[in-house]
Structure formats: C-alpha cells, structure tokens
Amino acid sequence: MNCKIGILTFHKSINYGSVLQAYALQNLLLKEGYKVEIIDYEPKNYANMYIPFKKPTTIWNILHNLNRVPVGKIIKEQNEEFKKFRDTYINLSREYNFESYYSDIFSQFDCVICGSDQVWNITLDDCDDIFFLPCVKHIKKIAYAVSVNDAKFNSCIRDIDLKNCISEFNYISCREKSGATKISNFIAKEDVAVTIDPTLLHSAREYDVICSKRIINQNYIFLYDMWSNSDALYAAKVISSLFNLPVYTLFTKRNVKSMIKISKYGVKVITKNMSPTDFLSYIKYADFVITDSFHGTAFSLIFEKQFVCINEKQNSGKLKNDERITNILSELNIEERYLRVDNIHSVKDLDNINYDIVTEKRNKLAKKSIDWLLKAIEE
C-alpha cells in the first residue's frame, strides 16, 4: 500500500460525468488505502473550450460571443462551482500544462492510471498526447475503463507512435466491448479487459455524502441532455404530458440560443445551483429521468430511478446508437430503456425497472472491475 498513484483524466472538464468519474476512481483507491492524486494537467485546448468568451479575432468568435453575452454571468458561475467542487473533493497534484516536462509530472508516482472517460477518443479536442503516456518509463502504466467511442485508431494520426505507446501499458481495460476489440486489434494483444465506469463502482450511499439537499421542492422529471438535442427535448415534452409533471434541465449547452430552444419545449432551465453535487441531487430526487448521456444513465442506475435514454438522430440523419449506453444497458438486461424518439409514447408501456435484479448485477460487475484494477496495481 506504499504505492503512490497518479490519475490522469478529464477532471477539469465542465462536464458532470467527467468530474464525478474522477472523484469516484480517486475515492475507490483512497478507500483501498493507496496514496492518490489526480494529476492537475490542463491540455492545450482546455482554456479555449471553457472560457465564456473568446478573443474577437474572427467572425466566428464574435458570433460565438454575441450568443453568450446574455448568459455570460451564468457560465462564469457554473465554472466557479466546478472549480469549488475540484478544490473541495479532488486531491489534486500541483498544476501542469502542455508545456510541462513529462519527467516533472510523473517522477513522483509509482503508478499512473489513465482514465476513465473518453481519454483515448482521439477525435476530441481535449484528447492530448499525454493520455497515452509517451516517453514515460520506469512506472507502471494502467488504462482503466478508457473509452474510445467512435474513434478509429491510426498510428500516424498524432505526433507520437500511438501503437507503441498503447502497447507499453502494463494493463488496459476499456469501458465498452467494441472499444476493447478495437484496441486489441490495433496493438495485436488479446488481454484488453472490459470494466465499468468508476461512477458505477459505488453505491448511492457513497454519493449521498456529497449530494446536495433537495433543491426542487415539487415532483418533477429531470432531463440531462448535453446538446439541447431536438429529439431529447421532444421526448421530454411528450413524457411531461404523459406523467403530468414539469421537466427541469441543467444549463449545459451554455448559450442563449439553446436556452430559448429549450424553453420552447416547455422545459425549465436551471441556471443556479449547478455544481456536480447539485447534479446528483437533481437525479436523486427526480420522479423520472430522461437522458442522452452515458453518465446520466449511470447515475439513474445508481440512484435506482425509472428512466429512459434517447437514441437521437445525428445531423447525418442516422441514429446515434451510443455504444457507451447500449453496452451498460445490455449488461444489465434493460436494453428497452434506449428509445428512439418516434417510439417515445411507448414509455408508458414500460415495466418498472426491477432494481433488486439490476443492482445485484451491477454490484457483480463492480466487484469484477475492482478486482481487475487492484490486481493490475499490485502485480
């Protein structure tokens, strides 16, 4: 237990799932007796992704800023609430950025865990080379429940030898079966495991420690929709009518155009109490949850809510078919919870989720994943 572990993940994202999965993995390892720090690394693109306003150097940036002027104060407050959460609940190393030497970042650790979240999704703006630990020697390297999502691996896609970097990891596990297969084929190794997201390793009782008290003092439906998608909003409108309950959603798209769009569907936009601990409260106390998000799904399962996931149409017209969601629903035998919007009225015909069965299955998956991780650290 003298092993000092560094966790490298998307802990600085203004994204509820990202910060809570970082918190969850950290707390699991602390509970097991390890010394743990989240490596406080900021990728090159982070600042530009999350600042309320961009430098007015292009027409696009000017239009972007105009769309945010009416909500700039809300965005700033949300950013501050995320920072407060990190400062309070995340055990951070000192700060590093893309200009830091890798030797300075990693020399203090015996083991580095990359993940979870989409840290190996090379199509994302915040997927930095560092998440593949290039030129990092003499420490154990573990990838835990990394997600590649739709990314196609190619050794030439980055400035590093991607295949060689991944091959040098001592242990690799992926969050989705398809991702594990993709990584196995890429590096020609068959021992890539499938493990569940860190958030799902804990019970609701462990999140109750940080969960805010009830905020909405009425019965309600909670919509967690990352992109203000029309399919999810239409589903919310239909389900609100079926259940005769109001729908609340968090301010995630972070611009006034989306806020107006959401309001047109009769959904109430939450613009205060937006911290990750508040997010937990909105799910915990909801009568029903609608989501298009993997972590919206995960916390619905953790708090044993009745819920549906919306299989949205993309700009191409094709269904999203999010493998992160389909994988966990399949593991728990509740695939019927993933609905197309043209089938949304069938929600009233769904049987209630039997959480005696589902939570037992989730606990077994959690034990298997924890056993894999502890073995990877100790061997």
Predicted regions and their residues:
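Active-site anion-handling motifs in enzyme catalytic cores
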Residues: M1-E379
